Amino acid sequence: MLRAIAEERGRLSLRREVCGLGCFKDDRIVFWTWMFSTYFMEKWAPRQDDMLFYVRRKLAYSGSESGADGRKAAEPEVEVEVYRRDSKKLPGLGDPDIDWEESVCLNLILQKLDYMVTCAVCTRADGGDIHIHKKKSQQVFASPSKHPMDSKGEESKISYPNIFFMIDSFEEVFSDMTVGEGEMVCVELVASDKTNTFQGVIFQGSIRYEALKKVYDNRVSVAARMAQKMSFGFYKYSNMEFVRMKGPQGKGHAEMAVSRVSTGDTSPCGTEEDSSPASPMHERVTSFSTPPTPERNNRPAFFSPSLKRKVPRNRIAEMKKSHSANDSEEFFREDDGGADLHNATNLRSRSLSGTGRSLVGSWLKLNRADGNFLLYAHLTYVTLPLHRILTDILEVRQKPILMT
């Protein structure tokens, strides 16, 4: 099936060069309706889902008058319709409002492929290689709809052409994912066919602790922190914030649920450190001795010097529910120069040393410049445009790194 789609896309490019778009329109409709019928409607199709997805395109007109008939230029209105395979209301194979090519591609992505997402806590060595200290893989499922991750039970909304890979139980799945100073969180989403004959990376991204902490500090209001301290702990603040991690070259994004690791105080900037062996601060010790350094602008690299990535934007933009913290440059680029960053092991020693428990001590630590602490980093979802997934599956097929 994948080979047939790739060959048809190649023929389409050739036809455009020879005689334009309209020359073989009927042939293309025949091909895509045949593909839809053969691979999704036939009952013998292996491991076939019971649902069928149709992409319907209608011409909608704007209310402003600009044309001869008082209507603005037509714009396509896209709807995703879902039917059971044995439904008597299935659109006919000759329905002109159905985009048969996109319907085939959508059903391919939703039904014919498996997806595995891996989240890892890593550091970068002097040579540019990534060292994985902890990772967790989880199977996810593609969906043309989405729902807010910060409020359970809300109704899903159609997100097509953006495809979402959501982890509803993200707090349980990534419960032990903590990141500290000098470390970064890396995310990789891999697609494979049902027989596992091929694998291809469709998303890679990373975000440094420093970027996560900066966003976290900005989002947690000073008023909430002070209210917690002045009320001697009676005011409970929910300190989970949602941070977006952009993909390379702006290809999709992932969302992280970020919260502070408990240190014995429920405030967002609590000062009561817990030195119990059960504390998450004792869960692991990083194995590197040299701190990472700022990225080099001349040659991107992620394990392999042959990888090429556009240098992304480095701006941080405010979001209402999600905050975009980076463009995932750390996952693909080498480091260079001398950074004024402390060794990651210092975080553990500082966190376990303990400070005063009084209100005065809280006030001093609130205003302390060097206030690093461990953060939970829970992956909530990855989202990508459908056409970018298709390109990676049919043409690029980049080999996975975190899963190896």
From Swiss-Prot:
Phosphothreonine sites (modified residues): T290, T293
Q: Name one Pfam family in it.
A: DUF2045
Mind listing the UniProt keywords for this protein, alphabetically? Phosphoprotein
Q: Which InterPro entries match?
A: DUF2045
Return the annotated region ranges for Disordered: 261-307, 320-340
| Keyword Phosphoprotein among UniProt keywords | yes
Give the source's domain of life in one word: Eukaryota
Q: What is this protein called?
A: Uncharacterized protein KIAA0930
What organism, scientifically named, is this protein from? Answer: Homo sapiens (Human)
